[in-house]
Amino acid sequence: NQIQESVISNLTLENKIWALSNETDLPILNSYQYTIGANYSKNKWIIDFEAYFKKTKNINTLDFDFNNTSLYNYSIGTSSIQGVDIFIKKQLNKYSTWLSYSFNSAKYRFDDLNDGNPFPSNVNIDHTVKWSHFYKWKKIDFSLGWLWHNGKPYTKINTTSDENEISEYSYSNLNNEKLKVYHRLDFSMVYNFRPHTNKTIKYRLGLSIMNLYNRKNIINKDLRFSNTNSEELKINDIRGAKISPNIVLRVFW
């Protein structure tokens, strides 16, 4: 069975660890799923649609107390996932483009967490859009892709101080905040050629640039206590890769 384990240093909700199931405190997961879809293909158009719903029971969570990691709460709950995927592609001679949209709502519910109210899954991203372009010119293949999606959920930390100025920290509602919107543009080109001296060998030379406009995306939040005696809590933004060029050479024989 899989247990969702909360991590103190991370403002998203959980890690995933594995344990053997039993008939008492670690029951076997039980789930069901419904899916419906449709597909259209004509005149170099492709349109694909799919909707789904999944319910899972007997999910386990191990939730640590924020101020004392030796204390923890063990809970069994459920998860529900529902979503829609739409894919559209068009081919025009040596150029093709495709656009996709995904809606996803994934929530957990545990009697002993979040006052028994449902809360978003750690990986829940409501809306995702991808738009890609491909073009072939002689022996060179070009591609351009744009990705956009909502920020991932995370849990806000509340700070309180007593009369002795000793700080205590607690969670607010689980995963009730979201990171900023994520988006980036990627470019690549690949050149395929053979040397005149040996036709049995094929070369592929490629150039790719990820995050072309150098978007400073926040992909997570991390918290650490400072090294001072005050034990001040520091919350840091973890950012994704900056603009990243890559060159690759492959040899086939």
PLM-predicted stretches and their roles:
Residues 1, 17, 38-40, 49-53, ...:
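Transmembrane beta-barrel strands of outer-membrane/channel proteins
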Residues 1-34, 51-74, 145-166, 216-220:
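Surface-exposed extracellular loop regions of Gram-negative outer-membrane beta-barrel proteins
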Residues 52-55, 70-158:
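Gram-negative outer-membrane beta-barrel transporters
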Residues 57, 148-165, 184, 191-253:
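C-terminal beta-signal and adjacent terminal beta-strands/loops
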Residues 44, 94, 139, 194-203:
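Short loop/turn motifs that connect adjacent beta-strands in outer-membrane beta-barrel proteins
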Residues 30-34, 41-43, 53, 78-82, ...:
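Residues that define the transmembrane beta-barrel architecture of outer-membrane proteins
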Residues 36-40, 86-90, 99, 131-135, ...:
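Residues on the lipid-exposed face of transmembrane beta-strands in outer-membrane beta-barrel proteins
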Residues 19-25, 33, 69-75, 83, ...:
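Extracellular loop and loop/strand-boundary signature of outer-membrane beta-barrel proteins
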